[in-house]
Amino acid sequence: PLTSIVNYVDLLSKLSLPEDARSYVEVLQRQSARLKKLTEDLVEASKASTGNIPVSLAPTDLNVLLSQVCGEYQQRLEKQVLEPVLSLCEPGAAAMADGRLLWRVLDNLMSNICKYAMPGTRVYFESSAAGGIVTITFKNISKYELNIPAEELMARFVRGDRSRHTEGSGLGLSIAQSLTELQGGSFRLEIDGDLFKAIVSFPQDGTQELHA
């Protein structure tokens, strides 16, 4: 039914309509697109939390993956007046992870930064390796007061009170956490005042699972 709604709204948008009717169709387009995205996120969240997603672990170069996702989001970061600062560890630090799922984790975190980071500030993306553990860290200053504990931010549908007018389902961090843990990794958030930090860690050799 949702696909039919989206398709019919798309057909309406191509008709010659009075100005007031066209504005209504534009609202329908935006809201149906948001509903479609929410439905997709719900399906993904359900699959991730139940482990109903195939996982293929292999040595994954975090530096390459992090550089690629930063490149993908360069224009969007510029549009939000955010300055990316990329800091990579020594070459050769590979995580045992599923590259496809890890990309989805990083994509969710980047999307979160674009929505909630304060314009005109720097956002930090770092990779590090120590003690057989490889880690990716995202840091940004929030444009909204972080009035909620870090652990609650990872609950489904939870967003800060003042951010509810922004785009998004409130599922991004929950999905990122589930997908990370599905690969045997660790996902945690840290909040210090308005500083928001997301930390994703994986074993370098793949011999053990991590726990937050």
Language-model region placement:
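Short alpha-helical segment of the dimerization/phosphotransfer core of two-component systems
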Residues: 30-35
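Conserved micro-motifs of the catalytic ATP-binding
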Residues: 50-55, 94-97
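Conserved catalytic submotifs in the C-terminal HATPase_c
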Residues: 56-59, 78, 83-93
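A conserved beta-strand-to-alpha-helix junction within the catalytic ATP-binding
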Residues: 56-74
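Short helix-loop "hinge" at the ATP-lid/N-box region of the Bergerat-fold HATPase_c
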Residues: 113-114
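Short conserved segment of the HATPase_c
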Residues: 145-158
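Conserved glycine-rich
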Residues: 184-185
